[in-house]
Amino acid sequence: EASQLLRDDRGRIKPFGKFFEEVRQIHPEYNERYLEAEHQFAVHSAQAAAQWAEIERDGNDYDLQYRTANDGKVRPAHAKLEGLTRPQDDPCWSEIMPPNGWKCRCRVVQVRKGKYDYTDRNEVSQLVREATTDLDSQGRNRAEMFRFNPGMDRVIFPKHHPYYNL
Protein backbone atom coordinates (compact mmCIF):
# COMPACT_ATOMS: atom_id res chain seq x y z
CA GLU A 1 0.00 0.00 0.00
CA ALA A 2 2.76 2.44 0.93
CA SER A 3 4.66 1.74 -2.29
CA GLN A 4 1.81 3.39 -4.22
CA LEU A 5 2.62 6.63 -2.40
CA LEU A 6 6.24 6.82 -3.61
CA ARG A 7 5.37 8.85 -6.72
CA ASP A 8 3.44 12.07 -7.23
CA ASP A 9 0.77 12.67 -9.90
CA ARG A 10 3.47 13.34 -12.50
CA GLY A 11 5.30 10.08 -11.75
CA ARG A 12 8.19 11.76 -9.92
CA ILE A 13 9.54 10.30 -6.70
CA LYS A 14 8.28 12.24 -3.69
CA PRO A 15 10.72 13.67 -1.17
CA PHE A 16 10.88 11.51 1.93
CA GLY A 17 9.12 14.07 4.17
CA LYS A 18 6.02 14.17 1.95
CA PHE A 19 6.06 10.39 1.52
CA PHE A 20 6.32 9.89 5.29
CA GLU A 21 3.36 12.22 5.97
CA GLU A 22 1.17 10.25 3.58
CA VAL A 23 2.25 6.86 4.95
CA ARG A 24 1.50 8.06 8.48
CA GLN A 25 -2.11 8.73 7.39
CA ILE A 26 -2.44 5.03 6.53
CA HIS A 27 -0.13 3.56 9.22
CA PRO A 28 0.22 6.05 12.12
CA GLU A 29 2.71 3.85 14.01
CA TYR A 30 5.10 3.16 11.14
CA ASN A 31 8.74 3.51 12.22
CA GLU A 32 10.19 6.61 10.54
CA ARG A 33 13.77 5.29 10.48
CA TYR A 34 12.74 2.04 8.80
CA LEU A 35 10.58 3.86 6.31
CA GLU A 36 13.37 6.30 5.48
CA ALA A 37 15.79 3.40 4.86
CA GLU A 38 13.22 1.63 2.67
CA HIS A 39 12.44 4.84 0.75
CA GLN A 40 16.14 5.44 0.12
CA PHE A 41 16.61 1.81 -0.92
CA ALA A 42 13.69 1.97 -3.38
CA VAL A 43 15.00 5.20 -4.91
CA HIS A 44 18.57 3.85 -5.18
CA SER A 45 17.33 0.56 -6.68
CA ALA A 46 15.25 2.41 -9.27
CA GLN A 47 18.23 4.57 -10.19
CA ALA A 48 20.47 1.49 -10.42
CA ALA A 49 17.93 -0.25 -12.67
CA ALA A 50 17.84 2.76 -15.00
CA GLN A 51 21.63 2.89 -15.00
CA TRP A 52 21.81 -0.82 -15.84
CA ALA A 53 19.60 -0.24 -18.89
CA GLU A 54 22.17 2.33 -20.10
CA ILE A 55 25.03 -0.07 -19.37
CA GLU A 56 23.30 -2.79 -21.39
CA ARG A 57 22.78 -0.38 -24.31
CA ASP A 58 26.51 0.35 -24.34
CA GLY A 59 27.32 -3.36 -24.35
CA ASN A 60 30.89 -4.26 -23.58
CA ASP A 61 32.29 -0.91 -24.73
CA TYR A 62 33.22 -0.06 -21.13
CA ASP A 63 34.35 -1.85 -18.01
CA LEU A 64 32.52 -1.30 -14.73
CA GLN A 65 34.05 -0.11 -11.50
CA TYR A 66 32.60 -0.17 -7.98
CA ARG A 67 32.93 3.06 -6.02
CA THR A 68 31.97 4.03 -2.50
CA ALA A 69 31.13 7.46 -1.11
CA ASN A 70 34.75 7.34 0.13
CA ASP A 71 34.10 8.89 3.53
CA GLY A 72 34.06 7.84 7.17
CA LYS A 73 30.55 6.38 6.93
CA VAL A 74 31.41 3.65 4.40
CA ARG A 75 31.07 0.13 5.82
CA PRO A 76 34.38 -1.76 5.99
CA ALA A 77 33.09 -4.54 3.71
CA HIS A 78 31.98 -1.97 1.11
CA ALA A 79 35.28 -0.09 1.44
CA LYS A 80 37.06 -3.28 0.35
CA LEU A 81 35.05 -3.12 -2.90
CA GLU A 82 36.33 0.38 -3.74
CA GLY A 83 37.87 0.28 -7.21
CA LEU A 84 36.76 -3.27 -8.01
CA THR A 85 36.90 -3.38 -11.80
CA ARG A 86 35.46 -6.09 -14.05
CA PRO A 87 33.97 -6.33 -17.56
CA GLN A 88 30.31 -5.40 -17.93
CA ASP A 89 29.37 -9.03 -18.61
CA ASP A 90 31.11 -10.41 -15.50
CA PRO A 91 28.73 -12.45 -13.32
CA CYS A 92 29.71 -10.46 -10.22
CA TRP A 93 27.43 -7.60 -11.33
CA SER A 94 24.39 -9.84 -10.82
CA GLU A 95 25.17 -9.84 -7.07
CA ILE A 96 27.02 -6.63 -6.28
CA MET A 97 25.19 -3.84 -8.11
CA PRO A 98 24.37 -1.24 -5.44
CA PRO A 99 22.48 -0.75 -3.24
CA ASN A 100 24.23 -3.46 -1.21
CA GLY A 101 22.63 -2.70 2.12
CA TRP A 102 20.36 -0.28 3.94
CA LYS A 103 21.42 3.31 3.28
CA CYS A 104 24.19 2.12 0.95
CA ARG A 105 25.61 5.05 -1.01
CA CYS A 106 27.89 3.05 -3.29
CA ARG A 107 27.65 3.14 -7.05
CA VAL A 108 29.00 1.49 -10.18
CA VAL A 109 30.50 3.61 -12.94
CA GLN A 110 31.53 2.88 -16.50
CA VAL A 111 35.27 3.28 -17.12
CA ARG A 112 37.30 3.15 -20.29
CA LYS A 113 38.38 -0.40 -21.18
CA GLY A 114 41.99 -0.99 -20.24
CA LYS A 115 42.32 2.10 -18.04
CA TYR A 116 42.18 0.02 -14.84
CA ASP A 117 43.47 -3.48 -14.15
CA TYR A 118 40.78 -6.08 -13.53
CA THR A 119 40.28 -7.19 -9.97
CA ASP A 120 41.17 -10.89 -9.68
CA ARG A 121 38.08 -13.07 -10.21
CA ASN A 122 38.73 -15.20 -7.09
CA GLU A 123 39.19 -12.07 -4.99
CA VAL A 124 35.92 -10.67 -6.36
CA SER A 125 33.98 -13.73 -5.17
CA GLN A 126 35.37 -13.34 -1.66
CA LEU A 127 34.69 -9.59 -1.57
CA VAL A 128 31.09 -10.08 -2.74
CA ARG A 129 30.48 -12.67 -0.02
CA GLU A 130 31.96 -10.39 2.65
CA ALA A 131 29.97 -7.35 1.52
CA THR A 132 26.69 -9.27 1.54
CA THR A 133 27.05 -11.37 4.68
CA ASP A 134 25.70 -10.30 8.06
CA LEU A 135 24.72 -13.24 10.27
CA ASP A 136 22.06 -12.82 12.94
CA SER A 137 22.04 -14.71 16.26
CA GLN A 138 20.46 -17.77 14.58
CA GLY A 139 23.11 -17.83 11.85
CA ARG A 140 20.81 -16.47 9.12
CA ASN A 141 22.36 -14.09 6.63
CA ARG A 142 20.42 -10.83 6.89
CA ALA A 143 22.40 -9.28 4.03
CA GLU A 144 21.84 -12.07 1.48
CA MET A 145 18.86 -10.24 0.06
CA PHE A 146 21.20 -7.53 -1.22
CA ARG A 147 22.86 -9.97 -3.65
CA PHE A 148 20.97 -8.79 -6.71
CA ASN A 149 21.02 -6.37 -9.60
CA PRO A 150 17.84 -4.26 -9.84
CA GLY A 151 18.33 -3.75 -13.58
CA MET A 152 19.06 -7.38 -14.48
CA ASP A 153 16.37 -8.73 -12.17
CA ARG A 154 13.88 -5.99 -13.09
CA VAL A 155 12.81 -5.52 -9.47
CA ILE A 156 13.18 -2.76 -6.90
CA PHE A 157 13.17 -5.06 -3.88
CA PRO A 158 15.12 -8.34 -4.18
CA LYS A 159 13.47 -11.76 -4.01
CA HIS A 160 14.66 -12.40 -0.44
CA HIS A 161 13.20 -9.14 0.89
CA PRO A 162 10.82 -9.60 3.86
CA TYR A 163 8.02 -7.89 1.90
CA TYR A 164 7.49 -11.11 0.01
CA ASN A 165 6.83 -13.00 3.26
CA LEU A 166 3.81 -10.92 4.29
Predicted segments with their positions:
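Domain-core detector
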Residues: E1-G101, V109-L166
